[in-house]
């Protein structure tokens, strides 16, 4: 099977170089690597990697950049793998991914185990990620776990290419595209199994550089789930839970916020979002005006 890897990146040239170097250590290399960026500034100077990398340019935004990658790959591959530009894969990740799709013909999407997720903390350094992975690979192999899930986690998710040729990420979810992974993979329900497995694993650094403003993200925390619900790709219960959880967290922690989270900004964005909901306005693109 031919495997295509798509990486969308913005404002992190140094990190991208480190990521590509880590990909060189994979037991099984991807057949195509697509790096979707906004400008040459996202690449830095000099050679990127010893790997052959297809560089494409896109308007900014996770969804737009990933869609550009999908258009580029088209019929070139059998599996499309997306990873964030701060996701470090275990050495066997791509090799195991190929075997999953070969041996489970009913699987259309798969997401791997995140050993540590810096998105929920102040972040994880590359050195720390490598230590996590080294420890995992040296430890006795755990029991294999494969379970059906409703959707994939955007930092590492792969799809059977033949099942997504008519799909695209919704570019009305701008910037970081919060919940775009749920929205995209929900379109695959009825086409086959969506699974999560510890056969694939990695570390999500959760790098804070290049993230959007607190106000914009707070707005998206309210509007995006309801917008996706209205499309039929998220239950009202889940959308409501996400909104409630985030508003409570932002309000509770705004007095003594974490250094790496703009709680006041997020809370302000939440309030603007709630006001728009009360007015019957569900436009994720409004975040660009904040």
Predicted regions and their residues:
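Short, acidic, metal-binding catalytic loop of nucleotide-sugar glycosyltransferases
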Residues: 21-30
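Active-site nucleotide-sugar/metal-binding loop of Leloir-type enzymes
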Residues: 63-79
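Short beta-strand-to-loop acidic/aromatic patch adjacent to the donor-nucleotide binding site
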Residues: 77-88
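Conserved donor NDP-sugar-binding/catalytic core segment of glycosyltransferases
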Residues: 92-126
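Short, flexible, basic/aromatic active-site loop/helix in glycosyltransferases
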Residues: 112, 129-149
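A short, conserved alpha-helix in the catalytic core of glycosyltransferases
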Residues: 151-159, 163-167, 174-200
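Active-site donor/metal-binding and catalytic loop motifs
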Residues: 193, 197-215, 224-228
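Non-catalytic, C-terminal membrane-associated alpha-helical segments of glycosyltransferases
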Residues: 215-224, 235-290
């Amino acid at each position: 099977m031919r495997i295509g890897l798509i990486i969308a990146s913005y404002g992190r040239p140094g990190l991208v170089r480190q990521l590509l170097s880590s990909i060189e250590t994979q037991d099984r290399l991807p057949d195509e690597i697509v790096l979707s960026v906004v400008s040459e500034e996202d690449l830095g100077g000099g050679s990127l990697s010893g790997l052959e990398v297809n560089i494409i340019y896109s308007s900014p935004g996770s969804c737009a950049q990933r869609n550009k990658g999908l258009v580029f790959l088209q019929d070139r591959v059998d599996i499309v793998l997306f990873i964030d530009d701060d996701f470090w894969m275990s050495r066997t990740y791509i090799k195991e991914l190929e075997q999953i799709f070969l041996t489970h013909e009913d699987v259309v999407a798969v997401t791997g185990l995140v050993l540590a997720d810096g998105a929920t903390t102040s972040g994880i350094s590359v050195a720390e990620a490598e230590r996590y992975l080294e420890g995992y690979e040296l430890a006795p192999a755990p029991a294999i776990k494969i379970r059906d899930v409703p959707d994939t986690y955007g930092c590492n998710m792969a799809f059977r290419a033949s099942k997504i040729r008519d799909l695209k990420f919704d570019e009305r979810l701008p910037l970081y595209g919060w919940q775009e992974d749920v929205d995209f993979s929900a379109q695959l329900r009825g086409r086959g199994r969506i699974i999560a497995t510890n056969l694939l694993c990695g570390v999500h650094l959760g790098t804070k550089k290049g993230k959007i403003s607190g106000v914009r993200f707070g707005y998206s925390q309210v509007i995006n789930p309801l917008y996706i619900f209205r499309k039929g790709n998220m239950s009202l219960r889940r959308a409501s839970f996400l909104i409630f959880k985030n508003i409570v967290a932002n309000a509770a922690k705004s007095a003594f916020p974490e250094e790496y989270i703009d709680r006041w900004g997020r809370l302000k964005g939440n309030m603007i979002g709630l006001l728009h909901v009360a007015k019957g306005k569900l436009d994720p693109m409004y975040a660009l005006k904040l």
